Swiss-Prot record:
Beta subunit (PAFAH1B1) inhibits the acetylhydrolase activity of the alpha1/alpha1 catalytic homodimer. One of its GO terms (biological process) is spermatogenesis. This is Platelet-activating factor acetylhydrolase IB subunit alpha1. The active site is at 47, 192, 195. It is an enzyme of class 3 (hydrolase). It comes from the Eukaryota. Keywords: Acetylation, Cytoplasm, Hydrolase, Lipid degradation, Lipid metabolism, Phosphoprotein. Belongs to the 'GDSL' lipolytic enzyme family. Platelet-activating factor acetylhydrolase IB beta/gamma subunits subfamily. Alpha1 catalytic subunit of the cytosolic type I platelet-activating factor (PAF) acetylhydrolase (PAF-AH (I)) heterotetrameric enzyme that catalyzes the hydrolyze of the acetyl group at the sn-2 position of PAF and its analogs and modulates the action of PAF. The activity and substrate specificity of PAF-AH (I) are affected by its subunit composition. The modification Phosphoserine is found at residue 2. InterPro entries: SGNH_hydro, SGNH_hydro_sf. The modification N-acetylserine is found at residue 2. It comes from Bos taurus (Bovine). Its EC number is 3.1.1.47.
Amino acid sequence: MSGDENPASKPTPVQDVQGDGRWMSLHHRFVADSKDKEPEVVFIGDSLVQLMHQCEIWRELFSPLHALNFGIGGDSTQHVLWRLENGELEHIRPKIVVVWVGTNNHGHTAEQVTGGIKAIVQLVNERQPQARVVVLGLLPRGQHPNPLREKNRRVNELVRAALAGHPRAHFLDADPGFVHSDGTISHHDMYDYLHLSRLGYTPVCRALHSLLLRLLTQDQGQGGAPLPEPSP
């Protein structure tokens, strides 16, 4: 399926239905931020990326990596593609780009969402060939079992298979076990059964941080710069 046939992999800006221009303002701010920063790691995605920046664990684990957070609430794969094609990768040379997006692609099939994520990986590989890409798996959502959980699970299966053996891309299952044995998700982990609480972010971020350090260490062994020290 080509990008022309798959709306999830066709770069598209968000329609400004509210009329305040916030999405484009954030995009322009991210482009400006990239002009005077030298990040080791760039995060891009939807609200799960955006809200991570407000948690103490971001400052503990990711600020020492000089990480930039380019998350915008509500974004789908096609919106991230548009942002990446329009300047958010132009002025930086990160070692790793973390991608977490897809749960908002409500009108798209699991196969289409997978195509959108693959298009993002391909674009990052083309624009930032030195960088590794880490794709975080979509989380389960909803207090009780529902079709969106199954769709996200299927996306994860497809993306994992698509990236298997990829030399510069890695899939990380971000779910530490949010679904309990009775099929429910606790509001202590996801306060609205979609977005993570501070408690919910902790295991996700620690697993991601471990992977990032491992990848950065591998690159350091190949002649990269020394790693920054984590915060105490």
